[in-house]
């Protein structure tokens, strides 16, 4: 297996995940800011690795597999951390909705790939907007420097949950014929 810069960036994102968890639980005043910084660095690599892979024509099968896995693991763990911190339905409900959607759509994409129709459930613009809203909301909720950033983070978290449901309905609609076909 050949490693290139986009794949190394994806691996770097995976390596950052345990550091995010450890720093999140440190009993220091700077821990929320540093955990948010780690998350932001990881989130930026999510955009940057794909950009470089396309720009430099360095897409690999391993990278195509690892990138969405790293993204989903990073986001799911950040959601679990934020949910654990707030201990409230208004954070848990959107987090559970978004995690469930990721599982459903991952299964749908795998199934559609088996049918040779993976492109019918390719990432859409609404999925990209959803991911951006998730990343920004999670960064704010990890950082939480003041009540206004927390409120904005929670509001954006709900926006991300709505976009999550919207994009899921789009993907399911695109696959409807195959899902209902005998």
From Swiss-Prot:
InterPro entries in the cross-refs: CDP-alcohol_PTase-I, CDP-OH_P_trans, CDP-OH_PTrfase_TM_dom, CDP_ALCOHOL_P_TRANSF_CS, PGP_synthase_bac, Phosphatidylglycerol_P_synth
Stretches that traverse the bilayer: 13-37, 61-81, 87-107, 146-168
Gene3D superfamilies: 1.20.120.1760
Enzyme class: transferase
Alphabetical keyword list: Cell inner membrane, Cell membrane, Lipid biosynthesis, Lipid metabolism, Membrane, Phospholipid biosynthesis, Phospholipid metabolism, Transferase, Transmembrane, Transmembrane helix
GO biological process: phosphatidylglycerol biosynthetic process
One Pfam family, short name: CDP-OH_P_transf
Source organism, top-level taxon: Bacteria
Enzyme Commission numbers on file: 2.7.8.5
One of the record's GO molecular function terms: CDP-diacylglycerol-glycerol-3-phosphate 3-phosphatidyltransferase activity
Record keyword Transcription regulation present: no
Regions of this protein lying in the Periplasmic compartment: 38-60, 108-145
Cytoplasmic side: 2-12, 82-86, 169-181
Family: Belongs to the CDP-alcohol phosphatidyltransferase class-I family.
HAMAP family to which the protein is assigned, alphabetical: PgsA (MF_01437)
Role, per record: Catalyzes the conversion of cytidine diphosphate diacylglycerol (CDP-DG) and glycerol 3-phosphate into phosphatidylglycerol. Essential for the synthesis of anionic phospholipids, thereby playing a role in balancing the ratio of zwitterionic and anionic phospholipids, which is thought to be important for normal membrane function.
Protein name: CDP-diacylglycerol--glycerol-3-phosphate 3-phosphatidyltransferase
Species in which this protein is naturally found: Salmonella choleraesuis (strain SC-B67)
Gene name per UniProt: pgsA
């Amino acid at each position: 297996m050949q490693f290139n810069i986009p794949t190394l960036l994806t691996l770097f994102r995976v390596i950052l995940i345990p550091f995010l968890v450890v720093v999140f639980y440190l009993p220091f005043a700077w821990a929320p800011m540093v955990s948010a910084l780690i998350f932001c660095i990881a989130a930026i690599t999510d955009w940057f690795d794909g950009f470089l892979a396309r720009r430099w024509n360095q897409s690999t099968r391993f990278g195509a597999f690892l990138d969405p896995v790293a993204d989903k693991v990073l986001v799911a763990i950040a959601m679990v951390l934020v949910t654990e911190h707030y201990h409230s339905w208004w954070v848990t409900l959107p987090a559970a909705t978004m995690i469930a959607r990721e599982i459903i759509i991952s299964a749908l994409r795998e199934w559609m790939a088996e049918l040779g129709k993976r492109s019918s459930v390719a990432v859409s613009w609404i999925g990209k907007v959803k991911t951006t809203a998730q990343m920004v909301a999670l960064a704010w909720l990890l950082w939480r420097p003041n009540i206004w950033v927390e409120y904005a983070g929670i509001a954006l978290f709900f926006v991300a949950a709505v976009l999550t449901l919207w994009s899921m309905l789009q993907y399911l609609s695109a696959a409807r014929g195959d899902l209902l076909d005998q």
